[in-house]
Amino acid sequence: MGQVFLLMPVLLVAGYLSLGAAMENQRLFNIAVNRVQHLHLLAQKMFNDFEGTLLPDERRQLNKIFLLDFCNSDSIVSPIDKHETQKSSVLKLLHISFRLIESWEYPSQTLTHTMSNNLNQNQMSEKLSNLKVGINLLIKGNQEDVPSLDDNDSQQLLPYGNYYQNLGDNDNVRRNYELLACFKKDMHKVETYLTVAKCRKSLEANCTL
């Protein structure tokens, strides 16, 4: 009986620590999701504003080209549909999100030059950098869920090439269109992955997309 009473304070402390860690994890998830939602909305606005400067025929032609082309981030292995996203582990979704955000740190310098808005290069880079730091904290805090990455997960960490800079200056309209379309596409991906990961770590019973 005495041993039981001695263990009770230890168990209570452990419980409080576990609860505190879970609350901090949710706080970080909330911040990360809010930040990527902001970036996704920003990407959508930038893309729509750019499309608004194009002629209808020009817009249709660029859309056809983009559907047949690819984004540089397509080399980062990620779930191809909602079903795969639902099956992916929290840690896998976090690693993919980190890699996608990281892949835009350099192209974002060009991204801000394509638009005449109030967002400067440093602000865009700062938004991406802050989100990357937050996702990295979440990865460290959730390492215990999956001790190590499997072979498929490790493919996401391949070096990132600067595809967008190689499109050339002779076709700036196409280059800017693809840049903005890919940025919007990737921010949507990250928003989806972080939202699913956040739900998995919460008490919500239904995390379907």
Swiss-Prot record:
GO molecular function: growth hormone activity; growth hormone receptor binding; metal ion binding
Matching InterPro entries: 4_helix_cytokine-like_core (IPR009079), Somatotropin (IPR034975), Somatotropin/Prolactin (IPR001400), Somatotropin_CS (IPR018116)
Pfam (any one): Hormone_1
Signal peptide residues on this chain, from the entry's feature table: 1-22
UniProt keyword annotations, A-Z: Disulfide bond, Hormone, Metal-binding, Secreted, Signal, Zinc
GO cellular component, one term: extracellular space
Binding-site residues, Zn(2+): 38, 191
Disulphide bridges: 71-182, 199-207
Localization: Secreted
BP GO annotations: animal organ development; growth hormone receptor signaling pathway; positive regulation of growth; positive regulation of receptor signaling pathway via JAK-STAT; response to nutrient levels
Function: Growth hormone plays an important role in growth control and is involved in the regulation of several anabolic processes. Implicated as an osmoregulatory substance important for seawater adaptation.
Sequence similarity: Belongs to the somatotropin/prolactin family.
Protein name: Somatotropin
Lineage: Eukaryota, Metazoa, Chordata, Craniata, Vertebrata
Gene: gh
